[in-house]
Structure formats: structure tokens, C-alpha cells
From Swiss-Prot:
Single GO cellular component term: extracellular matrix
PANTHER family, per database record: CARBOHYDRATE BINDING DOMAIN-CONTAINING PROTEIN-RELATED, CELLULOSE-BINDING DOMAIN-CONTAINING PROTEIN-RELATED
Signal peptide residues on this chain, from the entry's feature table: 1-19
Protein name: Stalk-specific protein B
Highest taxon of the lineage: Eukaryota
Originating gene: staB
GO process annotations (BP): cell differentiation; extracellular matrix organization; sporulation resulting in formation of a cellular spore
Localization, UniProt: Secreted
Primary localisation category: secreted
One term of GO molecular function: polysaccharide binding
Amino acid sequence: MRSILILLSLLLTIAFASASFPYQCGPYSCQFGQVCRIDNGVSNCIPINDCHEVSLSTKVVGTWVDGSRGNKRFTQYDITITNNLNTNIKQIYIATDYTLRLRDHSNNSIWNVNLLPNGILTLPSYQPSINAHASFTFGLIIEGTQPANLNVLSVSF
């Protein structure tokens, strides 16, 4: 009985200590509608509307009907990630959903960005960061004319 009380006290102490320090968030740990913001190793989940450090903009490059693909309509987009900070963005994770209907799963349908198996987009190895007040653009071709839903999951600076 005494050892159970000691164990419970120890677990309660650990729980209290863990709750009083900022926890390390990542691209998978924040709730829907939140962004994991990591500033010099200190991380927290914030509402997506409060994340002014980075912005995504979508521009239509062109739309066409492809007869060789069953007369399907495709649209090419440029997606620009803009760093609004006075410091470099070290890493960014961008969420996608069912609206990212790539023309095919090749480098001809998405470029200048890494598409992970789980559908998350990250910076390519040749672009390890985005400089202060700079932008980085990647492109994609999707089926239809509706742009893909893209949301920042995590940003580290």
C-alpha cells in the first residue's frame, strides 16, 4: 500500500512538472485549426488565424482540358510561402486533404516541394529554409478547377 502511495505521488509530481513547462509540439500534435509554432526551441499550439509569421497564397497559372486523359480538366497552381518574420523559417509543414487531386503521382504534377506519404508538404532538401521577408514558390497540377486546401501545420524559426 505504501509503495502504491509513493508511486502515485511520484506520478502526480511528474504530471504537474510536465504541465507547467511548454510541451514540444510538432506537425501532428496540435488540434485541428491550430499551428505548431516553434521559436528557438520553445513550442506551442496557436490558432491558425493567429499565425502571422507565414502565409500561403495560391495563383492560377492555367487551366486546360486534356484529351489524352479522358477530357479531364486540369489546373496548374503556383503556391507561394511568404516569411513575414525578421528571422529565417527553418522548417514548415503544410497539410493537404482530399482536394489535392494531383494529375498523377510524378514530378510532373508537383515540384519544388516534398510530398510525404501522409500527404504533408515540406521544403525540399535544396531549400532548407526561407529567409526573413522572403518567399518560396512551389507548383502543382490538380484535376479540376478548385484549388487544394492547404494549411500550415507547423512552422519553426
